[in-house]
């Protein structure tokens, strides 16, 4: 089994938040939980958090997918928190934090694109749930008619 603390450490490293200043432990754990559910749904796995471990053991590629999706969830949380930021100035100094929400949103979009690309490599998409059977021609017969061979 993979320790949850190992995955959380990887996630915090990817976020650039090793000290836990951007998101609290509960927020990061929530992102990890949501990520595991999304990965299970998208690639057909059965991972779950059981106490302090993730069972069954995460393989290398699946662990990367879980961390990538959790990173996107964290960006969504940070975008929501940054949406209330404002711009202010005093004299010749100005502080503008209004673009933080957009920056987190852009990062979230990039991470989700990478996640979807990785999922498509594992589970190729099916075109509108239709099976491509290639060059098939239907045979049409009329009842009661004889057909001569040519």
State where each predicted segment sits.
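Intrinsic-disorder/low-complexity loop/linker signature
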Residues: 52, 90-92
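Elongated alpha-helical scaffolds
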Residues: 60-79
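Conserved short "hinge" loops at termini or chain/domain junctions
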Residues: 1-60, 121-150
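Polybasic, proline/glycine-rich intrinsically disordered low-complexity segments
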Residues: 99-125
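Short, surface-exposed beta-strand/strand-loop-strand elements in extracellular ectodomains
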Residues: 84-89
């Amino acid at each position: 089994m993979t320790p949850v603390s190992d995955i959380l450490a990887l996630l915090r490293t990817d976020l650039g938040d090793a000290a836990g200043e951007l998101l609290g432990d509960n927020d990061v754990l929530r992102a990890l939980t949501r990520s595991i559910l999304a990965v299970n749904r998208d690639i057909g796995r059965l991972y779950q958090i059981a106490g302090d471990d993730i069972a069954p053991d995460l393989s290398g590629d699946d662990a990367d997918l879980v961390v990538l999706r959790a990173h996107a969830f964290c960006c969504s949380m940070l975008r929501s928190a940054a949406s209330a930021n404002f711009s202010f100035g005093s004299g010749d100094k100005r502080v503008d934090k209004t673009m933080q929400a957009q920056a987190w949103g852009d990062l979230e979009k990039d991470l989700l694109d990478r996640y979807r690309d990785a999922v498509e490599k594992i589970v190729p998409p099916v075109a509108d749930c239709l099976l491509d059977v290639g060059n098939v021609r239907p045979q049409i017969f009329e009842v009661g008619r004889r057909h001569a061979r040519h």
